[in-house]
Amino acid sequence: MFKVVVAAAALSDGEYTEDSVLPGPAALDLPLTSATLPNHDDVPCSPTGEVTLKQAMVVSCNPAFGDLGMKIGADALREQAAKFGFGDSPSVPMRVTPSSVPAELDAPQLAQSSIGQYDVRVTPMQMAMVAAGVANRGTVMSPYLVQSVIGSDLSVIESADPTELSQAVSPRVADELTDMLVATVDEGTGTKAQIPGVRVAGKTGTAEHGEGRRAHAWFISYAPADDPQIAVAVIVEDGGVSGSETSGGSVAAPIAKQVMEARLK
């Protein structure tokens, strides 16, 4: 799920496109350590051991994004995250815990951070802002909870004033991200968010958070992809009651689908 932020940084850099080729082995050897960054189930991301950036997003290839994060660098990753709102504590009107990317990262830590692990901290609101920002062709809006307050006579006492927070990515980059996220739902890890007759853009996330604990299942999405009406972020802590099958695609994506369907009816 945080891979969307990494891809945004890479595409904005100008040196990468969705067709850029990245390593996709079963496990990525990390510098400065004997540790590796494994892919899901310790299998390669493709038969050739290489993937394009788009393919890496579709199958959520950990080694590819770990390698990409190390190549673009910690500063670029933090700057891109900040453009989406990381580090801010917005008022909605109550204060919201800020999301964060660690300030100091060596190469192995940067690789782990690039798949949303190590010490990356995000809230559901922040990831909803990422989804909405991409859906809005790069423009991130300031969040709020209440659209309007209406009196007993149905007159509007107070209403929210939508304001732009930042331009996280260019419209071109947002369109490229949308293309990748639609493919993720059409044919990748997010198929359980598919809605008949609607193009859905989405990204799974499976966040480990301690030895012996089941992963948090995440999913972010927006729809319709060509004319977005809703953006969603779902987290199922500890995978809910999913048993051993805990992943964003299997647990959180169906919930996001139901939320989007309810809005689009």
Where are these predicted regions, by residue range?
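Beta-lactam-recognizing serine transpeptidase/beta-lactamase-like catalytic domain environment
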Residues: 5-238
